[in-house]
């Protein structure tokens, strides 16, 4: 709490980092400039929430699909090892992920450009140099790294569903779609909400 309150306190002053002892009070002037005079801030806010919404939506969908697959194969011998390999992107630091995809998306030497050129005949361009391709790239990279996190949460949720509900659904003749929509998804909504909150906090840090 103290760092947050101290940051709010400092925001009410005009100062240089090298001369903090000479700061002078300006009140809400910094906020006034930020909200009403800065053209970049609203765009940054819009882009941040657009990227967050898109990334989290993709992560929930893909995470649930992956969680469902691992839930169905949980009794197979090597399922735990496969799950461990799947969650490895979470362990990578943002710097490492950024450098890897910087090379992958390089328009001259990147493998992505090579595939687009040789397979689809699309001429390489600066994927991170144009607004729309850059946003799509960030969403894709963000989703790639954090979908396993959502998968682990939703898999934990699926593990909490009582076997009695599956047995009752089987007796009633419910198909896989009814089981998924009437039993599994309602049972893991709290896990989805937890994942959304945690990921939203992480995505806002992109700002």
Where are these regions (language model features)?
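A structural signal for multi-pass alpha-helical bundles of membrane permease subunits
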Residues: 1-207
């Amino acid at each position: 709490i103290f760092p947050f309150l101290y940051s709010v306190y400092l925001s009410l002053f005009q100062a240089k980092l090298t001369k903090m002892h000479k700061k002078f009070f300006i009140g809400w002037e910094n906020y006034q400039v930020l909200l009403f005079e800065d053209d970049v801030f609203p765009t940054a806010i819009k882009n941040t929430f657009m990227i967050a919404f898109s990334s989290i939506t993709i992560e929930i969908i893909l995470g649930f699909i992956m969680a469902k697959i691992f839930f169905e194969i949980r009794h197979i011998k090597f399922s735990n090892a496969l799950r461990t390999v799947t969650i490895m992107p979470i362990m990578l630091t943002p710097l490492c992920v950024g450098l890897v995809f910087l090379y992958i998306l390089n328009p001259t030497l990147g493998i992505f450009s090579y595939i687009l050129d040789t397979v689809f005949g699309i001429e390489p361009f600066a994927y991170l140099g144009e607004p729309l391709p850059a946003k799509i790239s960030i969403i894709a990279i963000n989703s790639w790294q954090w979908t396993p996190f959502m998968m682990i949460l939703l898999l934990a949720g699926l593990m909490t569903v009582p076997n009695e509900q599956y047995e009752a659904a089987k007796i009633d003749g419910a198909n896989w779609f009814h089981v998924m929509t009437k039993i599994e998804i309602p049972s893991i909504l709290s896990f989805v909400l937890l994942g959304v909150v945690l990921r939203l906090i992480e995505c806002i840090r992109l700002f």
